[in-house]
A protein has these predicted regions:
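Surface-exposed, proline-anchored Ser/Thr-rich loop/turn motifs
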Residues: 261-289, 299-300
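Beta-strand signatures of extracellular beta-sandwich domains
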Residues: 218-220, 296-300
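Short, basic, glycine/proline-bearing loop/turn elements
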Residues: 68-84
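C-terminal beta-strand-rich structural cap/linker in extracellular carbohydrate-active enzymes
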Residues: 231-257
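Short, small/polar residue-rich loop motifs at catalytic or cofactor-binding pockets
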Residues: 49, 292-294
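Non-cytosolic beta-sheet module surface loops
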Residues: 200-202, 211-213, 276, 286-291
Length: 301
């Protein structure tokens, strides 16, 4: 939109500005360390006073992370970021940094499921730069894929945490530091209500790094049973390629996102309207569910 000095001033006046972090995040998910720093993706990294940078990893104007993972990802021996399951886990690692670093965010449709059709996909599924505006496949069937649903659940957990009313002020504060020039990247949130450390190895080989923590003591992994003992303000960690952790300074019980069971509930009355009625060839069905889940509608004449 403008140079950084002008955007900083506009942010001080209250304007929200786009923060395009597509290239850097994608370099990291593909396993390359060149141009893979996240520092400039967040307001503190730009020297802003206000957390008014709307950070995004994907958009209507940028290539899909998963598409480039599969097409161009880095490899080392048997480890390949071009593998679907591996690439999805790396997108999950990137999403942890994107979601849990303070400031507003934008996510693009189906990114939470690892959408892997190019932004230039044509209606015949070929890829051509002239097809930027072509209709893209709608992939609700991704939800049936265990690895894709795992990415979806991770997004849900990250957003559930940052939307917790107890921590709202921490996720709009400037009390964080992003260290992301190396292959092991980290984010430290030194909030008043919660303190977090996100760390991950974006290399395609094991890596060891000394990671700073906001305070000494026991830090609890939020999405596994691990914990990290910290002495002297930092800890040496060795991570496998694509391995990441979200540590908190207290043991927070997180609710696991699970699928709603498919079940028939004939006794449940669901408001339904069908227009027009009577109908000829097509109709619009409006309904309201009491809980989210898969729905099957059968119409009989």
């Amino acid at each position: 939109f403008a140079d950084n000095a002008e955007e900083k001033e506009l942010a001080d006046y209250g304007m929200l500005l786009w923060g395009n972090a597509n290239y850097n995040f994608n370099q990291a998910t593909m396993g390359f360390n060149t141009d893979a720093s996240f520092n400039y993706a967040f307001a503190n990294g730009r020297g802003w006073n206000q957390q008014h940078l709307v950070t995004y990893m994907e958009s209507h104007d940028e290539e899909r992370l998963m598409y480039k993972n599969i097409m161009y990802g880095n490899t080392s021996g048997a480890y390949s970021t071009r593998d679907l399951a591996t690439g999805l886990k790396r997108n999950e690692m990137a999403a942890a940094f994107w979601a849990l670093t303070p400031g507003p965010k934008t996510m693009w449709q189906f990114g939470e499921l690892g959408y892997d059709y190019s932004i230039n996909t044509c209606t015949d599924l070929s890829v051509n730069n002239n097809c930027r505006l072509a209709v893209k496949p709608i992939k609700w069937d991704y939800l049936a894929n265990t690895n894709r649903k795992g990415l979806y659940n991770a997004y849900a957990q990250f957003l559930k945490l940052r939307n917790n009313p107890s921590y709202t002020n921490d996720f709009i504060s400037n009390k964080y530091t992003v260290t992301s020039n190396g292959v092991v990247k980290s984010m430290q949130l030194n909030g008043d209500s919660i303190k977090l450390v996100v760390l991950g190895n974006f290399d395609v080989n094991p890596a060891t790094a000394n990671v700073a923590f906001p305070s000494d003591g026991i830090w609890y992994s939020m999405y596994s049973n691990k914990y990290q003992s910290v002495v002297g303000g930092s800890a040496s960690v060795t991570l496998q390629p694509g391995e990441y952790y979200v540590y908190a300074n207290k043991n927070i019980s997180t609710v696991t996102i699970t699928d709603v069971l498919n079940r028939d509930m004939p006794e449940l009355k669901i408001p339904v309207t069908i227009t027009p009625n009577p109908l000829r060839t097509s109709a619009t069905i409006n309904y309201q569910l009491t809980e989210s889940g898969q729905l099957s509608i059968h119409a009989y004449d």
